[in-house]
Amino acid sequence: MDVGFLSSDLFTFGLIPVLIFLARICDVSIGTIRYIMISRGFKFIAPVFGFFEVTIWLLAIGQVMANITNPICYIAYGAGFAAGTYIGMELEERMKLGMAIIRLITPLPTEDFIARLRQYGYGVTNITAQGANGEVTIIFMVVKRAKIPHLAILIRDFNPHAFYTIEDVRSASEGIYPIEDKNNPFSIFKRPFLFIGKRK
């Protein structure tokens, strides 16, 4: 590379800040996913992400220290951190890692709805409880987070104004889950077969 370009204002105030910004996006995005993996029990994958995260961070902070009198580098460093945090959360949401527990509370009759859930292969636990306005049914399900959109559709079909909550689950030792055809990612919507066993 031309030595003159390396000492030019374009390189110092343009290219270097851009590289710092991109490096921060990468390492913070990886760090966000790593933290979520740790919280959800992916203990063997998280260290791999940690290695790349800290390596990229060292490259970024090294350039900041090498250009410590360049204020644009500080702006790029902070902006990259903010953008990386947002992008990391978006990536994790699209990856749909881990398990979740869905808790549905309804005063409506649930026999047909529960039968439909079980037909699709979901493990359902239901109990009768007392709500503010009378008797209600509480339905519990532990599912892969990738299945939440499908369950949300089923719940809206059952009751468009249903009250339900979704919480992360670190791990699930045993349970009933839909079997998926690996050649058809949409097979869950067609096959009511079950898998009984461990899910991590």
UniProtKB/Swiss-Prot annotation:
GO cellular component terms listed in the entry, alphabetical order: plasma membrane
Primary location class: membrane
Location in the cell: Cell membrane
Gene3D superfamilies associated with the record: 3.30.70.120
Keywords: Cell membrane, Membrane, Transmembrane, Transmembrane helix
InterPro entries named in the record: DUF2179 (IPR019264), DUF5698 (IPR044035), N-reg_PII/ATP_PRibTrfase_C (IPR015867), UPF0316 (IPR022930)
Span of the signal peptide: none
Keyword Transmembrane annotated: yes
Segments traversing the membrane: 3-23, 44-64, 71-91
Any one Pfam family match given in the protein's UniProt record, by short name: DUF5698
Protein topology in the membrane: Multi-pass membrane protein
HAMAP family: UPF0316 (MF_01515)
Protein family membership: Belongs to the UPF0316 family.
Name of this chain's protein: UPF0316 protein Mhun_0543
Organism this protein belongs to: Methanospirillum hungatei JF-1 (strain ATCC 27890 / DSM 864 / NBRC 100397 / JF-1)
